[in-house]
């Protein structure tokens, strides 16, 4: 295993994250040094808020273009740091955000043996040139890796029937009724299942760092790249296993520790 230490940054505005359980899970799985830190965006100066605000997305159908953030945008960054949900639905270019965060990682920790995993409520997106638009992403896999709790909820799609029923009436009453009807079939904000699902994304981040491959196309694998909430809940909560290929890969990684 190339990694000698994993530093995971909590997102305290999302109380469903059982950070101590995640720490134990990582230690039991990889037998490596694991350190938990508070939110990466907590107790930071305005320079970080300004840099992060500059990674915001304004045009969903155009590649990323940097801009100079306004004071209002910087204030929104401060506000979102205190809220469990990305209430303003601000979108961030995931790769630009990753580059920004990497500049504020302590110099003595910027080496190939220390993997930083940032948990955040910020909604990360990447531009897809196949359809020329941005898509929400739960994981930006590199070092530091970013795992978006909002992305886990928003990126994998809800059942098709959910959207079809919602199209007939967008009122709050109808939305609440539909959400109640399909409750349990997808992750919601303040969902107690979120922490366990997070473990799977952390495994994907580690796999990407170790092998350059984060996802699997096999639905029976915990590394499966789920496009639907149903698939996500199955791979991370019901199945919770690796396919034979990735089971072997993880054993090799662990044996190299």
Positions of PLM-derived features:
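N-terminal low-structure segments adjacent to metalloprotease catalytic domains
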Residues: 1-137, 250-257
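Metalloprotease/metallohydrolase-associated module, dominated by Zn2+-dependent proteases
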Residues: 6-13, 135-193, 210-257
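Catalytic glutamate of the conserved HExxH
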Residues: 197-209
């Amino acid at each position: 295993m190339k990694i000698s230490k994993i530093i995971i940054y909590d997102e305290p505005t999302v109380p469903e994250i059982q950070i101590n359980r995640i720490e134990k899970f990582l230690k039991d799985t990889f037998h490596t040094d694991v350190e938990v830190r508070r939110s990466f965006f907590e107790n930071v100066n305005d320079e970080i808020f300004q840099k992060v605000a500059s990674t915001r997305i304004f045009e969903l159908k155009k590649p990323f273009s940097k801009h100079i953030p306004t004071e209002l945008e910087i204030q929104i960054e401060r506000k979102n740091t205190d809220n469990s949900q990305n209430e303003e639905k601000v979108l961030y270019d995931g790769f630009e955000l990753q580059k920004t965060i990497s500049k504020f990682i302590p110099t003595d920790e910027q080496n190939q043996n220390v993997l930083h995993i940032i948990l955040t409520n910020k909604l990360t997106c990447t531009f897809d040139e196949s359809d020329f638009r941005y898509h929400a992403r739960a994981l930006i896999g590199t070092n530091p890796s970013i795992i978006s709790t909002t992305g886990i909820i928003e990126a994998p799609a809800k059942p098709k029937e959910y959207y079809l029923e919602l199209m007939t009436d967008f009122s709050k009453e109808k939305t609440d009724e539909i959400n109640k009807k399909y409750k349990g079939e997808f992750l919601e904000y303040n969902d107690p299942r979120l922490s366990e699902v997070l473990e799977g994304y952390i495994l994907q981040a580690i796999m990407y760092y170790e092998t350059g491959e984060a996802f699997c196309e096999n639905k029976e694998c915990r590394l499966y790249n789920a496009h639907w909430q149903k698939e996500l809940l199955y791979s991370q909560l019901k199945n919770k296993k690796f396919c034979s290929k990735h089971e072997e890969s993880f054993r090799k990684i662990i044996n190299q520790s």
